[in-house]
Amino acid sequence: METKLVLALIACGVICLLQTTPTEATGKHVQQLMKVFRAIDFDFTKKAFYLHRAKYGVQNQLRNPLYLKAMSLPRSAKLSQPCLKKMIDEVNDLESTFYAGFSFNCHDHDQYSMDCLEAAEPTYLDGLKKLAASTEQCLVQK
C-alpha cells in the first residue's frame, strides 16, 4: 500500500516537472518586452483622462497579448529587436492620431471633450489590435 502511494507521488512530481519546464525562459522574454514597453513615451502634459485611455489601450490591446505570446516561447527563442522598434514607432503614430482625433481634428464635438475621445478611441484600439497581430508574426528572430 505504501509503495503505491510513493509511486503515485513520484508520478505526480514528474508530471508537474514536465509542465513547468517549457516556461523556464518566460521571465527573460517578458522582461525584455517590459523594457520595450517602458520606452513608449507618453506626453504627460496632455489631459489625464486622455492619457489614462491611451495607456489602457496599449496595456490591454498590445502588451497583454504579446506577454502571453512571450510566455509560450522556448528558451532558445530570441526576440526580434527591429520588430519591437517598429512596433514602438507604430504605437507612437497611433497615439498621435488618437490625440489628433481627440483634439484639433474633432469636428463633430467640442475639442478636448469626452465625446471626441469616445469618437476617436475605437480607431485607436483597432489599430493596436492589428499592431499586436502583426508584431506576433515577427516577434521571434529567425
From Swiss-Prot:
GO CC annotation terms, alphabetical: extracellular region
- Signal sequence: where? 1-25
Q: Which InterPro entries match?
A: ALL3/gSG7_salivary-like_helix (IPR056799)
GO molecular function terms attached to this record: toxin activity
Free-text activity regulation comment from the record: Zn(2+) modulates binding to host coagulation factor XII (F12) and high molecular weight kininogen (KNG1).
Keywords of the record, alphabetical order, are: Blood coagulation cascade inhibiting toxin, Complement system impairing toxin, Disulfide bond, Hemostasis impairing toxin, Secreted, Signal, Toxin
Which cysteines pair up through disulfides? They are: C83-C138, C106-C116
Q: Where in the cell is it found?
A: Secreted
Q: How does it assemble?
A: Interacts with host coagulation factor XII (F12) (inactive and activated). Interacts with host high molecular weight kininogen (KNG1) (inactive and activated).
Q: What does this protein do?
A: Salivary protein with anticoagulant activity. Inhibits activation of host kallikrein-kinin system by preventing the reciprocal activation of coagulation factor XII (F12) and prekallikrein (KLKB1), and subsequent release of bradykinin. Inhibits host factor XII and high molecular weight kininogen (KNG1) binding to negatively charged surfaces. Weakly inhibits the alternative pathway of complement system activation in the host.
Q: What is this protein called?
A: gSG7 salivary protein
